[in-house]
């Protein structure tokens, strides 16, 4: 269990509780979680973060009524800046989006502006929103993470409790390499409900070479770990930076969707440009 799982800041969340579904617009349904909850234990301070990045959300279940009452549907793309005070709690996001279902809006841009305003207010940070008509995305190919997959290793694993021990002495030699490693075996659990979160992760770095077996064991150790997606990515970035000391580092995870939403956080200290195309499990 994370050290802050019972923090007072989490007590008021609807997550893990029985809730009513509202279908008329209600911005108060959105709930934020302070990023400081996981950053403080990691020694990360808001005014001196070792990374940049965004939390990329895809909204697959977004619908509202136009001015004449005709239902509209869209796929939404949301980017929440890493400097925001709060992350957005996903169940509250789902409930909030449901409140659009029977609400009339004059046009698509009014919907986009409403989302942008409400999410920015909840997160206390910068948010950008784009809405796509379905025919704009039809035929879009399934994406993939560029890099070398480290999953197919003939090793025995018997520990699934989170530990950074595997990263001790995980680099070798003095030669500087630049490589991108990928794993589809990332699995963590919701901080509150402990429901499984499934993801793929891309780690791009420049520095002394990281032992792939040790890295895979470290990633698999998240299997019983309880934290939100964004918190896991920041923990992985921080641990790799601390133990492996790369000159450049980027960590990007794309998680499978739940409740019509997927969350795809990335953190980097270099010029990293994430691909936003959904992966095969998304």
Curated annotation (Swiss-Prot):
Its EC number is 1.7.1.13. One of its GO terms (cellular component) is cytoplasm. Keywords: Cytoplasm, NADP, Oxidoreductase, Queuosine biosynthesis. It is found in: Cytoplasm. Its main location: cytoplasm. The keyword Amino-acid biosynthesis does not apply. Pathway: tRNA modification; tRNA-queuosine biosynthesis. It holds the Pfam family QueF. The active site is at 190 (thioimide intermediate), 197 (proton donor). Substrate binds at residues 88-90, 229-230. It catalyses: 7-aminomethyl-7-carbaguanine + 2 NADP(+) = 7-cyano-7-deazaguanine + 2 NADPH + 3 H(+). GO terms for molecular function: preQ1 synthase activity. One of its GO terms (biological process) is queuosine biosynthetic process. NADPH binds at residues 90-91, 258-259. InterPro entries: GTP-CH-I_C/QueF, NADPH_dep_7-cyano-7-deazaG_red, QueF, QueF_N, QueF_type2. HAMAP family: QueF_type2 (MF_00817). Catalyzes the NADPH-dependent reduction of 7-cyano-7-deazaguanine (preQ0) to 7-aminomethyl-7-deazaguanine (preQ1). Homodimer. This is NADPH-dependent 7-cyano-7-deazaguanine reductase. The gene is queF.
């Amino acid at each position: 269990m994370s050290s802050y799982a019972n923090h007072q800041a989490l007590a008021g969340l609807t997550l893990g509780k029985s809730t009513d579904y509202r279908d008329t617009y209600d911005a108060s349904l959105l709930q934020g979680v302070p990023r400081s909850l996981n950053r403080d234990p990691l020694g990360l301070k808001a005014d001196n973060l070792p990374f940049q990045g965004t939390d990329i959300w895809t909204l697959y279940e977004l619908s509202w009524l136009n001015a004449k009452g005709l239902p509209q549907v869209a796929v939404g793309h949301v980017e929440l800046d890493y400097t925001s005070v709060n992350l957005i709690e996903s169940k509250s996001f789902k409930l909030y989006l449901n409140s659009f279902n029977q609400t009339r809006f004059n046009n698509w841009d009014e919907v986009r502006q409403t989302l942008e305003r409400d999410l920015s207010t909840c997160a206390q940070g910068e948010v950008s929103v784009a809405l796509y008509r379905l025919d704009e995305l039809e035929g879009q190919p399934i994406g993939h993470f560029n890099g070398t997959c480290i999953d197919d290793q003939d090793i025995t694993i018997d520990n699934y409790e989170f530990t950074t021990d595997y990263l001790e002495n995980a680099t070798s030699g003095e030669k500087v390499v630049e490589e991108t490693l990928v794993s589809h075996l990332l699995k963590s659990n919701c901080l509150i409900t402990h429901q499984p979160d499934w993801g793929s992760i891309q780690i791009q770095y420049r520095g002394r070479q990281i032992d792939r077996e040790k890295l895979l064991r470290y990633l698999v150790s998240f299997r019983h770990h309880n934290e939100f997606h964004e918190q896991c990515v920041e923990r992985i970035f921080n641990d790799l930076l601390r133990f492996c000391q790369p000159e450049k580092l980027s960590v990007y995870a794309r998680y499978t969707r739940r409740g019509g939403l997927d969350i795809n956080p990335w953190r980097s200290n270099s010029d990293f440009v994430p691909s936003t195309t959904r992966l095969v499990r998304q």
